[in-house]
């Protein structure tokens, strides 16, 4: 029986490793900005949080007393994810693969709720105050050429103006 459990554990570990990814710092910054449309003014803070929470590893799991933290953003099983969903309506296992779309969606939700409660959504992450509340620009150093960042900011401004205009006409 113990041999079967050991084999099962090994096989499940290999499967997780096949679906997991460890990002490079700039790779994550570019993906958050370009694919997931992270706000430019928050990008360095998000990258800092990921570095200190998971070391850019999508399969990271941190064990806590009653629960555990999962994925890049180390999202808590107590409040946000669970086998049946929880507040982010997501299983914790789905936060441990190489597709960070659901991780980002949940992280944004956590940020928004904590922003409403505490005035700073980043305080939901324990690493924020000691590591990421000051100047975090070093986390983006060498990741973008200046024109691509300015182009993304301009696109964000144009999109925001378009959304405001659409809301006025609705």
Stretch-by-stretch model annotation:
Residues 63-170:
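Catalytic and binding regions of secreted/periplasmic enzymes and modules that target cell-wall glycans
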């Amino acid at each position: 029986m113990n041999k079967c459990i050991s084999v099962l554990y090994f096989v499940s570990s290999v499967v997780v490793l096949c679906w997991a990814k460890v990002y490079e710092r700039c790779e994550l910054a570019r993906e958050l900005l370009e694919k997931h449309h992270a706000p430019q003014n928050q990008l360095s803070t998000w990258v800092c949080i990921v570095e200190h929470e998971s070391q850019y590893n999508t399969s990271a799991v941190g064990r806590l007393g009653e629960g555990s933290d999962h994925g890049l953003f180390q999202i808590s099983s107590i409040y946000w994810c669970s086998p049946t969903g929880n507040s982010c309506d997501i299983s914790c296992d789905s936060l441990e693969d190489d597709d960070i779309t659901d991780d980002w969606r949940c992280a944004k939700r956590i940020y928004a709720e904590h922003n409403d409660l505490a005035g700073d959504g980043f305080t939901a992450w324990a690493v924020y105050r000691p590591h990421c509340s000051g100047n975090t620009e070093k986390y983006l150093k060498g990741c973008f050429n200046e024109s691509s960042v300015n182009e993304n900011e301009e696109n964000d401004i144009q999109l925001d103006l378009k959304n405001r205009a659409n809301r006025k006409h609705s």
